[in-house]
Amino acid sequence: MKVYSGSDIRNVAVVGHSHCGKTSLISAMLHAAKMTPALGRVADGSAVTAYDDEEVARQTTMANAVAFAEWNGVKVNLVDTPGFHMFVHEARAAMMPVESALVVVNACSGVETMTDRVWKYATEVALPRAIVVNQVDHPKADSRLGRQQMIEMMQQRWGRQVVPIELPIVDDKGFHGVVDLVTMKAYMYQLDGSGRGEAGKIPHALEADSQAAHEALVELVAEGKDELMEEFFREGTIPEDHLITALHEAIREDRIFPVLYTSGLRNVGTDHLLDFLKVYAPAPAEREPIAARATRSTPPAHSNGEAKPGDGYVNEEMVMRRMDDKEPLALYVYKTMSDPFAGKISFFKVVSGVVKNDMTVENFTRHESERLSHLSVMQGRKPAEIQELHAGDLGAVPKLRSTLSGDTLGDRAHEIFLEPVSAPEPVMTYAIEPKSRGDEDKLAPALHKLMEEDSMVRFFRDPQTNEFLVAGSGQTHIEAIVSKLKKRYHTEVTLKAPKVPYRETIRGRAEAQGRHKKQTGGHGQFGDCKIRMEPLPRGSGIVFENDIFGGAIPRQFVPAVEKGIHESAGRGYLAGYPVVDFKVTVFDGSYHDVDSSEMSFKLAARIAFRKCMEQAKPALLEPVMRVEIESPDEFAGALMADLNSRRGRVQGMDTAGTGTVLRAEVPMAEMLNYGTTLTSITQGRGSFRMDMDHYDVVPQHLSEKILATAKKPAGEDGED
């Protein structure tokens, strides 16, 4: 395997909406570069970057995958990304180790919801990008969305910087070539799947369109560049070598978003796309220096292993690190994968320096040493071992002990910490139960391995309901987790809707006496307290106040009263849910010199608490979620109607590109399976996020149903 310098590397994320043909396009590029003996197909599982069993079964990419093509002296690293909304966070993570992106657009559907989202991600990180209109060979491509209409749609969304650098050649043979608007040559394909075009003259029918498009491209490239503008107005054009240099610079600076045309399935235009990446895509060596924190003091202490911004920083000093072989070694781990044969594989970018096989490095995030044995580059799931990798390249290494995604590794003497890409919070949670005792023993280790490779997986125990919960980005995601547990780790589980963490409260004021007295042989038990309970605003918790004067209850027993109140509140009154948002004041009582004790006053407080609850208008509270829903405009009405049916309160509606963002407050009980409904309403083009916002009183008719099915706490505490 050849070793490449940073100037001869192109790192490219391939992003776009689900089913726009990203994986097929990468397979076609690899075949055109003769990296694979045949054209890989997603449908039969032969595509290089679609190797996971779940991905093949569902015919959709669910995690980032890496492949590379060696093309005319450069190495093109391609990061395939999911386009389905449940996994689109992976596309954001894929933008960290690359210098450019190919935004793939379906020739029939045009710009879709996730296309807009990944474009937004790329804009946020100022990532240079080109647009690839794929599946141009589809019979309905031209009739459903003509070429000019497609360009206008993209310009409307993303600005006039969107400009064709190619024109598709479509005639009675179908799509079988492209016109290069820089060199003004046509490239024709035999449609044999080889992906190799032959240069020739532009077809007569496209001469006028090609000339007009060439002039529009030249004018946009020259815009804002005085020397080029003068040359353009003086000569009427710009020499080809000047145009290539200027176009490369314009793409790197996000002043132009060029449009190319391909067919991944028939392998048309892919060799020209590789040529484009070689000539115009930024190399790692051209990247601006990367900002990094100088150091950190302690490793993060989080159960899911995530590095959190701000954890353990010694200071906020920032350093700039150039992507250069001469800089100290630094590696950023952008992906972790669990392989049934190799174990855990860590995918990394060489941010600076040169990494060599069998080198020992420091994990700056966790303050542990790691040995880099079997240094490799990945072709899908297959590693190709290599002796060294230079600044800017992408590599992988198996069996690192402590390293997780988001970690920074490198030369111990030059510690830096690169900010990890934060994952969004999961939006769907299920209770998970092992089917057998053997499954129970294997469940936690298996889920923790899945959490290592997927930042959206969460596994935890609910402290209120005591259930084990698994959380993910949607129904499909959680189903995939369960399938992986069974197939990969031989662990079978049952999914159930999680219990809603209801709470209880009071809406009125009450006073009560709790008197605990028990006489047995020897010392007896005696405790007597009077308390007052009153409601507090939502979110106040429990407030305890001591208003005892004159020693009615000795000072040493007052904490026992408070403890008894807290214990009773934790057990609930109506249905065993914790009681919150109230103030309790102990204002009187009595004691016995011999028989009183902490336990006696704790039991007395429990009795007083239950009496007060009975009189203070107890009520059931439910968690209310803050929900944000993104979808195309045409689904806004149906989504609002659905939210209203779920007792939701719409708080506002905003515009996001050509889509709509709905903001609402909805009870958690109504949102447990919302992901499935949203997919149905929006035809898979919507997404949502939700976070806990506040608790509110459950309507009476629903409260009665909930209480009727809930298990009530048994027995009284103490004696009156």
List the model feature ranges, each with a label.
Residues 1-720:
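Structural and coupling elements of P-loop NTPases
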